[in-house]
Amino acid sequence: MDIVLEATSQTETQVAVQLEPLSSNVVAIVPAAGIGSRMGAGKPKQYLPLLGQSILAHTLDKLLSHPLISQVIVALHPEDADFYALPQAKHPKLKTVIGGSERANSVLAALDKAPDNSWALVHDAARPCLMASDIDKLLTSRVQFPQGAILAMPVRDTMKRANSLGEINSTVCRDNLWHALTPQLFPTSLLRLHLQGALNAGAVVTDEASAMEWAGISPGLVAGRADNIKVTHPDDLELAELFLMRAKA
């Protein structure tokens, strides 16, 4: 499920940040140490087959082929027995690290291998339908949002808040609400600092943007494509297949 964010006014005070030049390297980080139990499969969901290769292979293809991404770092489970069988594992732009028990720990492990003067572009392993145009939009947004930004989608559906019985408690105003997507793009040293700080403080860190929010920084929101779905449930595989086939047509 995507995180839902509420947009803030651009006139609000921003915490001062140390900015990275746009010419800095862009390092893609893929946290892939999770199990993905909601798929009900016998293997991590990122290795489920999708149009002749795994979900993760499709995701890596999208990142490795982008000309502005200089390196891709994948955080793996210590007992991962599938990754090194992927053709992408031998790509010269790709590195691996051992991830942690939570997404944030895996991202931190990868950040430790990224240059300080770079931009970290963090993308879910199970989002195989990412388009190069969305990466381009996010990288271009560094001019407007030098503190970092994420791909997101405005909430279009009516939102309901439930009570403990699974009944509707209230209708939530959807004005300024966005679904958080990935990639999420931040200056590497800044993300490393605040991700570690948020974890040390016991803050709830569900994505990279939430660590920046914890530090008082308001990341930008960049409207992304609706087909950039996260494969979370079995039905999502059919939808991802449809989107990938349409992109190749």
Curated annotation (Swiss-Prot):
Keywords: Isoprene biosynthesis, Nucleotidyltransferase, Transferase. SUPFAM superfamilies: Nucleotide-diphospho-sugar transferases. The record marks 174, 230 as: Positions MEP for the nucleophilic attack. Pathway: Isoprenoid biosynthesis; isopentenyl diphosphate biosynthesis via DXP pathway; isopentenyl diphosphate from 1-deoxy-D-xylulose 5-phosphate: step 2/6. Gene3D superfamilies: Spore Coat Polysaccharide Biosynthesis Protein SpsA, Chain A (3.90.550.10). The keyword Transferase applies. Disulfide bonds: none annotated. It catalyses: 2-C-methyl-D-erythritol 4-phosphate + CTP + H(+) = 4-CDP-2-C-methyl-D-erythritol + diphosphate. Its EC number is 2.7.7.60. GO terms for molecular function: 2-C-methyl-D-erythritol 4-phosphate cytidylyltransferase activity. One of its GO terms (biological process) is isopentenyl diphosphate biosynthetic process, methylerythritol 4-phosphate pathway. The record marks 38, 45 as: Transition state stabilizer. Belongs to the IspD/TarI cytidylyltransferase family. IspD subfamily. PANTHER family: 2-C-METHYL-D-ERYTHRITOL 4-PHOSPHATE CYTIDYLYLTRANSFERASE, CHLOROPLASTIC. Catalyzes the formation of 4-diphosphocytidyl-2-C-methyl-D-erythritol from CTP and 2-C-methyl-D-erythritol 4-phosphate (MEP). This is 2-C-methyl-D-erythritol 4-phosphate cytidylyltransferase. It comes from Shewanella oneidensis (strain ATCC 700550 / JCM 31522 / CIP 106686 / LMG 19005 / NCIMB 14063 / MR-1).
